[in-house]
Amino acid sequence: QTAKMLRQLMHMAQYVQSHALHFFHLASPDLLFGMDAEPAKRNVIGLIFEKPEIAVKGVMLRKFGQEIIEMLGGKKVHPSFAIPGGVNRALSPEQREKILQQVDGVIANFQFALDLIKDYYAQHGKEAANFASFSSGYLGLVDDNGNLELYDGKLRLRDEKGTILEDKVDPKDYLSIIEERVEDWSYLKFPYYKKWGYPRGIYRVGPLGRLNVVDGITTPLANKELREFKKLSINGIVEGSLFYHYARLIEALYAAEK
């Protein structure tokens, strides 16, 4: 159980640093400066000069996640930690206290980011609702109660209306519901829901896909945000691709709380 919790700790740290990197460094320049802004300004360097307080929050969030990875794995990139049956390193009491002392600030910074993205949607509601919005299936991991799971769960697939098509499928049995198509113009494979065929059976994954399949989140602040997120549509299925940012920050908040 201890080894599992340590693995989860590293995994949540990875979500914290990765989601912070995406939102603050990659996405926020587009959102804050406008997608038509000069490319020379519309980047993380422009963010540092124009809105340094926001840039610093992003840097510190990523630093927090990376430092946890380093504590457990010995290094920030390609850590050596998980081994068959457990882990190869413990967390010292001093390291645990260092993490705990920073958690409240990390949570507050993600709440700041959530306020930022919600302000953007309030000002660009029509654009957010219509940009790259299309019907598809959604696939993600859930726990036994249908809550968000980022570490170890079962597969759930919903359609665009919110109907559960497949539930509690063991990931090792994914080929029982998923097939892959090969196109001659791409090295990528195109997975789809086997019963519906291609292209009807295409589905989305990632933060938007995951929040569209879950019933709840097990941490209070992220679950409150999920309830608001679900109100963006009548049936709780959010289709606009610009809402990936919102979903990603809710996941980051969950990871920080977890």
Predicted regions and their residues:
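Active-site bordering "gate/hinge" segments
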Residues: 1-258
